[in-house]
């Protein structure tokens, strides 16, 4: 049953990412190269790829060099933080900005709701949490920090920003930096909540 759950999650995860890429290419208004750069500029895509890699490693190569990385409890727990932020920001803030239909709507639901729920459920019931430490919260901030830096640098040259709250052209640097500071606070608080929850679960399940 565990392997079936993971296998379904692997299929759904990669299907959604690949389908979104195909749709993005089909509907592109710029060159293929620029389209690919833009596609991989979305935190949603990067986070879902991380989730798909974690699930894939669990299923096929848990003891390989790369498998040990993506099945490590700290990596999975950090990815839980990222995918929860993806789901929360999209469903609370961004969903109202467009109305996808057909395949795009299906992919949209999988990326922002289904995969996050599956991954969080797996973390809650299947991932050991006894190695989690409070300092992990700060390490997990490195990925979103690097992401924001690269998005802002590239946006300076391409004038493309994947999300309205990081759009310097529309809002200016002051507003964007305030938005980013708010996001980092959300990441930090959520990271601490994930670690705290993990410690409680570990304590009451006897992992310690």
What are these regions (language model features)?
Residues 142-162:
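Juxtamembrane non-transmembrane "cap" segments at the membrane-aqueous interface
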């Amino acid at each position: 049953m565990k392997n079936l759950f993971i296998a379904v999650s692997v299929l759904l995860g990669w299907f959604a990412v690949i389908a979104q890429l195909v749709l993005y290419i089909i509907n592109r208004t710029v060159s293929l190269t620029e389209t690919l750069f833009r596609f991989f500029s979305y935190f949603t895509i990067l986070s879902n790829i991380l989730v798909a890699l974690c699930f894939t490693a669990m299923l096929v190569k848990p003891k390989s060099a790369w498998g040990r990385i993506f099945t490590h409890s700290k990596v999975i727990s950090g990815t839980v933080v990222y995918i929860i932020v993806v789901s929360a920001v999209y469903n609370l803030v961004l969903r109202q900005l467009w109305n996808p239909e057909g395949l795009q709507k299906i992919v949209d639901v999988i990326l922002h709701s289904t995969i996050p729920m599956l991954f969080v459920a797996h973390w809650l019931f299947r991932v050991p949490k006894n190695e989690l430490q409070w300092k992990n919260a700060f390490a997990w901030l490195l990925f979103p920090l690097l992401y924001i830096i690269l998005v802002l640098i590239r946006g300076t040259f391409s004038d493309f920003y994947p999300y309205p709250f990081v759009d310097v052209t529309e809002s200016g640097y002051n507003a964007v930096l305030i938005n980013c500071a708010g996001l980092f606070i959300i990441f930090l608080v959520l990271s601490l909540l994930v670690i705290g929850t993990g410690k409680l679960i570990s304590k009451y399940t006897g992992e310690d």
